[in-house]
Amino acid sequence: MVSLSLRGARRTAKDAASLPFLSWTLSLLALNPLLVSAKSAADYYVRSLPGAPEGPLLKMHAGHIEVDPENHGNLFFWHFQNRHIANRQRTVIWLNGGPGCSSMDGALMEVGPYRLKDNSTLEYNEGSWDEFGNLLFVDQPVGTGFSYVNGNQYLHEMDEMAAHFITFLENWFDIFPEYERDDIYIAGESFAGQHIPYIAKAIQERNEKAQMKPKWSLRGLLIGNGWISPKDQYPSYLTFAYEEGLITKDSRTAKNLEVLQSVCESRLEAGKNKIHLDDCEKVLSEMLTKTMDVSKNECINSYDIRLRDEAPACGMNWPPELTHMNYYLRQPELISALNINPEKKSGWMECSNAVSSTFRTQKSVPSVQLLPGLIESGIPILLFSGDKDLICNHVGTEELINNMKWNGGTGFETSPGVWAPRHDWTFEGEPAGIYQYARNLTYVLFYNASHMVPYDLPRQSRDMLDRFMQVDIASIGGSPADSRIDGEKLPQTSVGGHPNSTAAEEQEKKKMKEAEWKAYAKSGEAVLVVVIIGVIVWGFFIWRSRRHHRGYRSVYNKNMSGSSVLERFHSKRSGADMEAGDFDEAELDDLHSPGLDREHYAVGDDSDDEQQHQRQGSRPEGGQS
């Protein structure tokens, strides 16, 4: 009996027997939506990018990874594949600060391969950090930038943030397993100076528990103008202001600020385990107010003291590209290109007040307390500072280092009472800053740089990154820069050009040409081998056919066409000068030569062997059909 299914196809009794299994499978999928909704790397592939420069699009992936299913918490990422591989695969994770400020700042204004030229046009960043490392930008905590979460379920503490980030990495590596064994570096700036050490510690704890899973190879941390040690950073405001001439000592303004400073220091003594202290925030706020130009309604840019901004922003409107960012990242075409989930209802914002006001870290200790343990565990750490930043100035970072104890010493001492020297760094003939190193900690001070060092000095910042990652390569993607420490030329790193720069294009064309010639040479060799084999086979068949022809010609007779087999035999015998009377059965066997038989059937046998060989040759490797 034949019945019809709902889809109108013919279904037999055998098919009907499989229905329970089908129903069970559908029920399983219904109960496990992850089996249906699981995404692959293809779902995150960025196929186009509005305003991208002419030429091939860089290989990118972007989208959301769920980290909090209960509250639909999703972190947004934007990943760029490296342009060149040096001696090993590396992945650099970049985080901006806030808390609650988007890492799209880093992607489009600092270390990413593109910079915004205007509201809708991108241009290449000549100092992008993706030359020797895959770049992964993440908007975190949930609610930051393109990331989102239901309602007001924002995070409060550092351990929550770190747990979300570990979940993000686990899920991200499930989708992109080819990067899980990369050397991992975590970099960022500002309040990321709190995030990064906590994430690093969480990775170490995860690795200790990992049994069947690969351990993540955390190779280093880079923190720029970081908010790491409040007890060292808060008092540095006034010290830095005096050094830079923003405040005149013994002036009325100075005395007012010193009163606030003393209150702050007393709070710090009692609250040394606090990341944020309102009484200390008042010092900077009052400083910006007292140094205002009332006639112009301008105040010091707290991120770059060389600049002024309208009050009360005092730097919040900087850099000027922020105007372009706000427009570009809200375009429907861009939202579609970066695979933004429809659940993300609100438009992109650089910094979220909701995230910042909730993330108060009342139970979290400052990350400076984690640094010694991380360094002693073998993780190299690099702290770098732009010398024109006020809000996270270099004076506070240097004080942090001077007071910190790690690996059997205090600060940069190499032995009791002896400190590691400061080395002068020049880049392409110009003073670039200083380098200082001791016991697995490196400090770099950039001259003429703001809170966002890579924004001001992209090529110098990548030179720093490449040296920290121990990249040593003469010329890939551009001309190597002349970078020197105390006048001594350092190992070459390519920091001069983007893959679409003229030098890089010429280099790529040269490589392609060489590859083409190698391909032609290999093709020529293959063709020659085929021709030789063909000639040999052709010659063999010619020889075989002639031999057969001679054998058959000896029994050929013009008058044999209508004769019987016996008559043909007699004719052959007479043609061979044999007498008819000598005919017997044995002679017939002799004339019916086994050798001739084998030769006759050998042609067919060869053909069969050849067909079998052809079938074997056409089989895909691994036995796949």
Swiss-Prot record:
Residues 39-522 are lumenal. GO terms for molecular function: serine-type carboxypeptidase activity. The keyword Ligase does not apply. InterPro entries: AB_hydrolase_fold, Peptidase_S10. It is found in: Golgi apparatus, trans-Golgi network membrane. Belongs to the peptidase S10 family. Protease with a carboxypeptidase B-like function involved in the C-terminal processing of the lysine and arginine residues from protein precursors. Promotes cell fusion and is involved in the programmed cell death. This is Pheromone-processing carboxypeptidase kex1.
